[in-house]
Amino acid sequence: MKIYLVGGAVRDALLGLPVKDRDWVVVGSTPQEMLDAGYQQVGRDFPVFLHPQTHEEYALARTERKSGSGYTGFTCYAAPDVTLEDDLKRRDLTINALAQDDNGEIIDPYNGLGDLQNRLLRHVSPAFGEDPLRVLRVARFAARYAHLGFRIADETLTLMREMTHAGELEHLTPERVWKETENALTTRNPQVFFQVLRDCGALRVLFPEIDALFGVPAPARWHPEIDTGIHTLMTLSMAAMLSPQVDVRFTTLCHDLGKGLTPPELWPRHHGHGPAGVKLVEQLCQRLRVPNEIRDLARLVAEFHDLIHTFPMLNPKTIVKLFDSIDAWRKPQRVEQLALTSEADVRGRTGFESADYPQGRWLREAWEVAQSVPTKAVVEAGFKGVEIREELTRRRIAAVASWKEQRCPKPE
């Protein structure tokens, strides 16, 4: 029996990055031998075991053979005669097909070290094309390591295009697509994930609402980048700088979906694109089984982001009504999320990356003023039933009006 550290732990250690999870491959052993040594079997489809002390995963070396469609149609073979090289060959990328023995020596049968040095994401073998999930995984790796200068090898991108055009991605379940997307949204450069999907044709298949934005022009005065698809990825990049929250990043990505519905004869203007985009947000989120909380926020951001841009022109009644509309009294975090997504929208434009966004500050200040109006005082004043809400709203409007007079500049 020989045991090797494999995959991501080896890769990230060589890149000088923190190692989160360690996975091991066991060569020359059997399930019974692992059980006798105290390991606990957890793999149903192939033999994976948990170490009795560390609880890290130890998998018997195995090969995989395509036996059906999609990413689940594989038959696994695990036996003592499967070599380390056999096991590593089934992996997606050369940089993930590295192993380390107990002496610290790196085993590299597929030039993963060379690709690490050259910052290349390259597939190990043609078997890559048998698993459509790998298209998303490579896009996610491209986003995860973009800050280190990694790019996808030409032949790998070509294979990803071929897989997409062959309809392989249609076998992916919504849950898997969302999971990979969610993971990509946590990276430093999530916009790279969607750009890679567009480069290989997968964006049109998996995110048609976003793909439809490319080639749709916006007024150059407000959008020097002109192309709405480019603007969308720029706003996502900015959102990633402003917040680590997947909620903020995903909803920023969806903020302008309505512009994809504008008839070409009305370009480059997109009047009413915010409310128009709400149905597209719902459609996308329902298809991918996006969590309800994120879906609801995305709907609100699509509908109201342009309203925040005009904050100085809003009257106090409209501001308080906005807080009602986003259910801020029960979900106060939405105020901050709306401020961040609106800021990402403004700064996600060519030449505006460092722009100030005072509307976000004013939104936050107005919220602090409105929520500080005490409900208890209204009740103690003798109001009952529906009168309590009406009087509370009146007092909130009055408080915001007083604040706005002192703190918020009057529109020109």
Swiss-Prot record:
SUPFAM superfamilies found in the cross-reference section: Nucleotidyltransferase, Poly A polymerase C-terminal region-like
Cofactor(s) the protein requires to work: Mg(2+); Ni(2+)
Binding residues for ATP: G8, R11, R91, R137, R140
EC number: 2.7.7.72, 3.1.3.-, 3.1.4.-
Gene3D superfamilies hit by this protein: Beta Polymerase, domain 2, cca-adding enzyme, domain 2
Catalytic activity as recorded in UniProt: a tRNA precursor + 2 CTP + ATP = a tRNA with a 3' CCA end + 3 diphosphate; a tRNA with a 3' CCA end + 2 CTP + ATP = a tRNA with a 3' CCACCA end + 3 diphosphate
Pfam family, one: PolyA_pol_RNAbd
Highest taxon above the source species: Bacteria
Subunit-level organization: Monomer. Can also form homodimers and oligomers.
Entry similarity comment: Belongs to the tRNA nucleotidyltransferase/poly(A) polymerase family. Bacterial CCA-adding enzyme type 1 subfamily.
Written domain comment of the UniProt record: Comprises two domains: an N-terminal domain containing the nucleotidyltransferase activity and a C-terminal HD domain associated with both phosphodiesterase and phosphatase activities.
Record protein name field: Multifunctional CCA protein
Organism encoding this protein: Escherichia coli O157:H7
Lineage of source species: Bacteria, Pseudomonadati, Pseudomonadota, Gammaproteobacteria, Enterobacterales
